[in-house]
Amino acid sequence: MSRKGSTPQRTVLPDPKHGSETIARFINMVMQSGKKSVAEKIVYGAMDVIGEKNPNAIELVQKALDNVAPAVEVKSRRVGGATYQVPVEVRSSRRMALAMRWLIDSARKRGENTMPRKLAAELLDASESRGGAIKKREETHRMAEANKAFAHYRW
């Protein structure tokens, strides 16, 4: 383990189109193999599709992220010879990261024909508390609820 202390949190520059740090992080999460321009086209394309139905796309994205973000998750903890799934609260930075990851993964699994449409549909569903990302959050919360008895093993 390093003795130099923790590394400082990297700052993300706000995205050029909307000036939002959340959207910039979302673009970075969508990006694959360093292709940022492709990721920007996907996210901005999805926001344009959302913009046709809802004039305030940024608020809708924020609402979708808030709906998907988990409050608790389970972590494995070894005690004696047994491994317990211990429920722990999720810190805010990890909440947003998980919400973005789940939204993007669910969007990639959807059946629409282009990625911007898949992402837009998933964001619209998540803002109305339905869709694959919401299912993932509910499953995580169910796991934490089922293992509430092991909450005293927290670290």
Swiss-Prot record:
Pfam assignment, any one: Ribosomal_S7
InterPro entries, A to Z: Ribosomal_uS7, Ribosomal_uS7_bac/org-type, Ribosomal_uS7_CS, Ribosomal_uS7_dom, Ribosomal_uS7_dom_sf
Record-level Gene Ontology MF annotations: rRNA binding; structural constituent of ribosome; tRNA binding
Database matches in SUPFAM superfamilies: Ribosomal protein S7 (SSF47973)
GO terms under cellular component: small ribosomal subunit
Stored CDD domains: uS7_Bacteria
One GO biological process term: translation
Subunit field text: Part of the 30S ribosomal subunit. Contacts proteins S9 and S11.
Entry function: One of the primary rRNA binding proteins, it binds directly to 16S rRNA where it nucleates assembly of the head domain of the 30S subunit. Is located at the subunit interface close to the decoding center, probably blocks exit of the E-site tRNA.
Protein family: Belongs to the universal ribosomal protein uS7 family.
Protein name per Swiss-Prot or TrEMBL: Small ribosomal subunit protein uS7
Species for this entry: Xanthomonas euvesicatoria pv. vesicatoria (strain 85-10) (Xanthomonas campestris pv. vesicatoria)
Gene this chain is encoded by: rpsG
